[in-house]
Amino acid sequence: MKKELKDLNKHGFNSIQAAEIKAYQELIDAQQALHANPRDERLATVEKEASNQYKQKQEIYVQFLKQKAKCHWLKEGDSNTKLFYRSIKQRRLRNNIYAIRDMTGVLKDSPGDIAEAFQQYYAQLLGTSMQDREKVQSSNLEAGPLLNDDQRQKLLGDPTVEEVKAAMFSIKGDKSPGLDGFGSFFFQDNWDIVGKEVYKAVSSFFNSGKILKELNTTFLTLIPKVNCPRDVSEFRPIACCNTVYKCITKILCSRLKNILPDIIAENQGAFVHGRFIVHNIMVCQDLVRRYGRKNTGPSCMIKLDLRKAYDTVKWDFVREMLLGLNFPHQFTEWVMECISTPMFSLILNGTPHGFFKSKRGLRQGDPLSPLIFVLCMEYLLRTMRKMTEDKQFKFHPRCKAMALTHLCFADDLILCCKGEPYSIQEILNNFHHFSKVAGLTANNSKTKVYSCGMKEEVINNIIEQSGFKKGSLPFKYLGVPICSKRISVSQCEKLIEQMTARISTWSSKNLSFAGRSQLINSVLLSIHQYWAQVFVLPVSVLRNIEQICRAFLWSGVWYSTAPGYISWENVCKEKKVGGLGYRDIQKWNIATMARHVWAVANKQDNLWVKWIHSVYIKKGDWWGYEPPKDGSWYWRKVCETKRVLIHAGLKDTLLNMRRFSVKAIYQQLITNQEKVFWASNIWSRYNVPKHSFCLWLAVQQRLPTADRLTKWGAQMQTTCGLCGTGQESSEHLFFQCPFSREVLEDLKSWLNSRNTQQNIQGICKWINRRSKQAKVERAAWNLALSAATYHIWQNKNAVQHGKPKQGREHVVAQVKFQICQRLQLINVTKLSSREKNLIDCLNSS
């Protein structure tokens, strides 16, 4: 198919931007000809064809730019071509490598030398095998469950057509493609054509156990791990795997993920269904509650940083683990064929370099790698579990009941024990055994030892023997600070920095109000959401977050103190009650923390809940429980959240929840507010988002018209710039100004309407009364109202800034075009013949 697809790209999708510009010009010419001869049916047909061609070319062009820009937060809205161009430029500047130090520290600054430095580094990193590797000890594996016959059977068998299709459609279409350049969108959109061939290719692998080498040839793209990388080691290699290969490994993953919860220990929190990252964080938070205090028992915790974890896993170790856990031989061979046969090329500054084979490692970017890595880390846990049979080994305080010796989330590893030499040495000895078996070693410069109640001499001996560094609290674990005292404002600075840094990467010139609004909802508040699942954040931090979001929405920067057009309290209301649908982050914080209250009440089967019942509640009643004074600060905050929820009358709600819903709790925490009748008109799914935002301000009379600006102290001309007669106000601009009246009258005539309302709210009421059953009519009127409001406002602003005023015909033509364009989003198969005729009439008139 490669030749045919290349021809399609050359003749069908070449010069995408030029084709879009040409189609737009042809549409303008056709519309001008039709305007001069409105009764000419041939010109009407030509205009309709030109309109369809332009829509098609524009959609292709926008999708092309969006894929290059990698704006994953932007799901819908305007074409945003300026934003995409800027994002593409920023990505190139950020990802291009102009100079780098090689493995020996020599600076390389020519393209050829840079490529050679990276090839040598990764050929050595991935192409080096371990000569004196120890083998997996079966006695250690027996310290945990092995696969039974039913589980083994679930892993085997040829995939069905439905299984292959489900695997392909589970791959996100906007992910970077592999060496062949075909992303999953191609296969999904053309499944009726290529589905059988994909199924044959996938089935061939499961039947033969061999994979075509072309399917397992991989691009490695290098992602910087630091802001300004200087050495070849400061990059993370991400594999861009072939899409058909991903389909194969997705099938293996779908079978394997159902087995993992039964064989992976509960203190491994990553990539196992039903386990969450916050569980490890919260247990760790409780472990350090006495660190930093005087007169406390000896405790030791080691935060291990694994050096190049995924890249150094030994393949022999993977095979021994799978077979040792009683995985079927055939399944083991499928996995080994996938991970041990890839060939690599490096992508540097957009160009492929080199072609080499690896001898170890799991590819980051391969769907199978995380699950295999979890199985590898299971050996460490079982080794540690075997170690605890030694009666001389002493657990970390509070850990004996659960036999807890470490916490693991992927390659983030914490080891803990009592702060005495023998126990610490046993922990280190068993980790060194794991290193010799798996190939995973500690990065001594980044591994930290934390302690309390220990003699300085003992600590220094451990540091000297291990080569690790001495650490102090607070420290960062899984993205958040771990501290023995209540989290402070200064410890939340990282959260604020993440938000402001993200805003700084965007240009407000390329983002409309609607674009900023979507960025706040999709990105900024999501950054806060992760922290809000773990901590009850300080009120001052939450207020700071609100200030940042408010400044960005109204000013496009994070540091502005200028007032907004609408109060933040009203902005954070739901759309149906007149707001923008942002969350009240203080109440959202309570709602997210309510998950832990619910989990404890329902005794959920996870590590943290077991820890809480073991250490604190024991056999007591949770709803009547009060935390001890010496309990950790975070546990007291969880109990405080419980009291808030009880006071809000949500105890019964939590008890009756079979599955926890943050949204349901949040809905009950926010005050009941009266719905506004105009919300459905403004936020119609067919409206252009930036038009909706403008109309949202206009319907509340919050647009910065001259009369409002002068009240705020602005010195300016108050005469309407569109007519030059009346005083500019919201009422005058949209309904009393002769220019605006003519625009609205033309649209009324075009839509065959007799509406006589003279304000936006009145028109909304009229639309809602007239078109409850007529979907197309309602959508057309909502589109007309929002588009007319937007273009009149933009025209006024253009005149105010010295630009020429657009004529009435031009504004009306723009509104009509956008109405017809957006009506194409309606599924015509579900429309009545009358509504189909209405769309045809609007397109042809």
What function would you assign to each model-found segment?
Residues 2, 9, 233-264, 282, ...:
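Conserved pre-motif C helix in the palm subdomain of viral-like polymerases
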